[in-house]
UniProtKB/Swiss-Prot annotation:
Catalysed reactions, as listed in the record: N(2)-acetyl-L-ornithine + 2-oxoglutarate = N-acetyl-L-glutamate 5-semialdehyde + L-glutamate
Miscellaneous field: May also have succinyldiaminopimelate aminotransferase activity, thus carrying out the corresponding step in lysine biosynthesis.
NCBIfam families: argD, PRK01278.1
GO MF annotation list: identical protein binding; N2-acetyl-L-ornithine:2-oxoglutarate 5-aminotransferase activity; pyridoxal phosphate binding
Keyword terms, alphabetized: Amino-acid biosynthesis, Aminotransferase, Arginine biosynthesis, Cytoplasm, Pyridoxal phosphate, Transferase
Assembly information from the UniProt record: Homodimer.
Residues involved in pyridoxal 5'-phosphate binding: 95-96, 128, 213-216, 271
One Gene Ontology term, aspect cellular component: cytoplasm
Sequence positions bearing N6-(pyridoxal phosphate)lysine: 242
Gene3D superfamilies xrefs: Aspartate Aminotransferase, domain 1, Type I PLP-dependent aspartate aminotransferase-like (Major domain)
Protein's name in the database: Acetylornithine aminotransferase 1
Pathway assigned in UniProt: Amino-acid biosynthesis; L-arginine biosynthesis; N(2)-acetyl-L-ornithine from L-glutamate: step 4/4
Length: 392
């Protein structure tokens, strides 16, 4: 029996090795990885640039403390601010921690402005922001809230993509609006074209901060460095993680100078956040993603995946309903349990991940090749053709 806490319904396979877009189990069987560790393995498995960055840094310094300046941390922060709207960065170890830092930054900002009564954060139905007590308080998804009540009474939830509902939900106690540009766990549902712009306008009107949770959408996943670029909207704060480390744990809260003005010494901290190993690897990830032509290639690969999904929907409308999402962050709505379909696809050598009850996520490494996309289509078709007798 495993000594691990039973917090995951783990598949009965041991993944022992990864290379590029492929995973291998204990029996040597290969799996085309269209999950990428849930949008984490930006450059696939074992990318030599990341391996070298980690080895080089490991020979120099693993950990000191955030009580000192750390060159690897300063270098990564500068790369992030040079490439984005942000002026300041706080480093953490995960997406949930990055969102926590974003919430604290917004509340601290309101307090520094002399408005401590503004502490509530407006969030949206079917959102997912992490599994800490604060971040599960920020969602209405009962599957992550169950058993943890009473939760923090600091969030107000309104329907996603309903700008009029958001306007009505703002009160004199509202400090900020927290939203995913594309809901990840919520079924790969994108914000409608005017929704994020409408939220930006509401924040400007009511002197609130706009926080974007780009934990899953960031670092090139949509074909842009961050998904808010698709919408032409400038946030005040974003939470980043997953793809930033390419498989090495790191999170970050990025903010404008004004939004970060309340974060003074002692207001927040992290023992391991921004450690040299994580920052060295994340710097190598950013160098690759920001290299000329990389994001253009991601968009080209995304177009091939779109065409693949259209063919799949035409040939197997008995199983697949529709596709949604952007770039290499795609969701397939299915006429069955998403978890059952994910298990079935795994039997045919394709790794995917569920999003809610009836959506299967396709989140391949951004380095997936045209040949691998063709192989993905072949395996998905074989799996879909074999589904009928199972469902009958």
């Amino acid at each position: 029996m495993s000594a691990l806490m039973n917090t995951y319904a783990r598949a009965n396979i041991d993944i022992v090795r990864g290379e590029g877009c492929w995973l291998y189990d204990q029996d040597g069987r290969d799996y085309l990885d269209l999950a990428a560790g849930v949008a984490v393995n930006t450059l696939g498995h074992g990318d030599p640039r990341l391996v070298q960055a980690l080895k080089t840094q490991a020979d120099i310094l693993w950990h000191a403390s955030n009580l000192y300046r750390l060159p690897a941390q300063e270098a990564l922060a500068t790369k992030l601010t040079d490439a984005t709207f942000a002026d300041r960065v706080f480093f953490a170890n995960s997406g949930a921690e990055a969102v926590e830092a974003a919430i604290k930054t917004a509340r601290r900002w309101q307090g520094a402005k002399g408005r401590p009564e503004r502490y509530r954060v407006l969030t949206f139905g079917n959102a997912f922001h992490g599994r800490t007590l604060a971040t599960i308080s920020a969602t209405d998804q009962m599957k992550v809230r169950e058993g943890f009540t009473p939760l923090y009474d600091a969030f107000d939830t309104t329907p996603f993509n309903d700008i009029e509902g958001a306007a009505r939900a703002i009160t004199p106690q509202t400090a900020a609006i927290l939203v995913e540009p594309i809901q990840g766990e919520g079924g790969l549902t994108p914000a409608t074209p005017g929704f994020l712009a409408g939220l930006r306008a509401l924040c400007d009107q009511h002197d609130l901060l706009l926080i974007l949770d780009e934990v899953q959408t960031g670092i090139g996943r949509t074909g842009h460095l961050f998904a808010h670029e698709l919408y032409g909207v400038r946030p005040d704060i974003i939470a980043v993680a997953k793809g930033l480390g390419g498989g090495f744990p790191i999170g970050a809260c990025l903010a404008t100078e004004d939004a970060a003005s309340g974060m003074t010494p002692g207001s927040h901290g992290s023992t391991y956040g921004g450690n040299p190993l994580a920052c060295a690897v994340a710097s190598a990830v950013l160098d690759a993603v920001l290299a000329p032509g990389f994001l253009e290639t991601v968009r080209e690969r995304a177009a091939l995946v779109d065409a693949l999904l259209e063919r799949l929907l035409r040939r197997h409308s008995d199983l697949f309903v529709r596709a949604q999402g952007h770039g290499l962050m795609r969701g397939l709505q299915v006429r069955a349990s998403a978890r059952d379909v994910v298990a079935h696809l795994r039997d045919f050598g394709v790794m995917t991940v569920a999003a809610g009850a009836d959506v299967v996520r396709l989140l391949p490494p951004l380095t997936i090749s045209e040949l691998e996309i063709a192989e993905a289509e072949a395996r998905l078709l074989r799996a879909a053709e074999a589904w009928l007798p199972i469902a009958a």
